[in-house]
């Protein structure tokens, strides 16, 4: 069994990232810790005026093959793997001295291979061999050895040494061991993912298959959740190892109760929808569906218009804004309705002050970022569905007018607005909109015509006028009945992908009703 506290007398430092190296080395030397090192790390320590012994001097074997072979030696690995109370005699027989602390980070394979001009040779030269081997040796022997893999760990490491007269606890050694094995797993996964995606080893800058023969995913736990989608399910939230800037996983919670599984799922839907707009916008989401979306002169205006779409569904909803939330809008929201989560790229001081009056409201800040997820995944029984993310936009120039009447300029603007919203509504999705605000949303129905009828019903419940509005459909109309239902509600223009066997009948129906219709040639199913 591991002793609780063990002293650090000898440390091996070998790092690619020199952040914090000299401060760490200086603190260790001040505690009379003997330093061993390699290559550029030893050079940096020596130039700082600190004593250090080269590993080559220890092993009696020089670094060779342009640094490919440096630490793969029994005097190094024996010093890391030797067990207290078991291996002392063998170590003494072979002149192996124990190493108590390993500080090591790996060649920057991930940051090199993310570059678009990375050659296969560049990638291969940044595959670390000796580093992972040492990490595994040290991490396996956490009963005696401590291992640090990240400059972010140095401060806590030194603090524990300071607090315990140069010793590290068993708990600290074990925690560092787990982190080291995680780092090795992440590193090996990155190498496997890269090489599995390389289509042709003969290419200088190889083409990468977006769907390689094997994928290895790494996620880091952010938090445990109160429960999963339902109270009888347990749950936790994990983020990508390298989250895309501007996506939900980069959030900072400023106040409120702990987040639930459903909070996060709904927050992601709301945030992804609102961040596609340039002008001030508000999106209100319930059960992963937008129930109100609007663009306005400011956050307050956008909120009022979005809320008016469906005040009933907005109760207990998730509200997302794409601009800094001001105090007046925060007050209007919190005085009017129960809110589960507020999301914005930032908040002014007054908004945050007022939010504290509703201490349970979860307030999330997500920094601006233009990054987009490259892939969507969905778990099925013992399998994973993977696809490129639906990041397809739409511009006026891509629309095809298929009816006798072309949409007016105002209708075109509303059509594109409704199309953007429909992309985030569960299929079958129908969105009625006018003046850059939703009038009614029909979501998740097995029949497209029923979704159209629901959109009209929601508008009627909210006492909003459908006449003169436009309609967006996430997929084509298989029959003319959807157009007939829209016409009876007062819809004047329609945007849809087209592509049905009965497009001719659908277009004829639109012409009969004097409806302008455009095809996008793009479908936005969402399940």
UniProtKB/Swiss-Prot annotation:
It comes from the Bacteria. Pathway: Purine metabolism; IMP biosynthesis via de novo pathway; 5-formamido-1-(5-phospho-D-ribosyl)imidazole-4-carboxamide from 5-amino-1-(5-phospho-D-ribosyl)imidazole-4-carboxamide (10-formyl THF route): step 1/1; Purine metabolism; IMP biosynthesis via de novo pathway; IMP from 5-formamido-1-(5-phospho-D-ribosyl)imidazole-4-carboxamide: step 1/1. GO terms for biological process: 'de novo' IMP biosynthetic process. SMART domains: AICARFT_IMPCHas (SM00798), MGS (SM00851). The IMP cyclohydrolase activity resides in the N-terminal region. Belongs to the PurH family. This is Bifunctional purine biosynthesis protein PurH. It comes from Xanthomonas oryzae pv. oryzae (strain KACC10331 / KXO85).
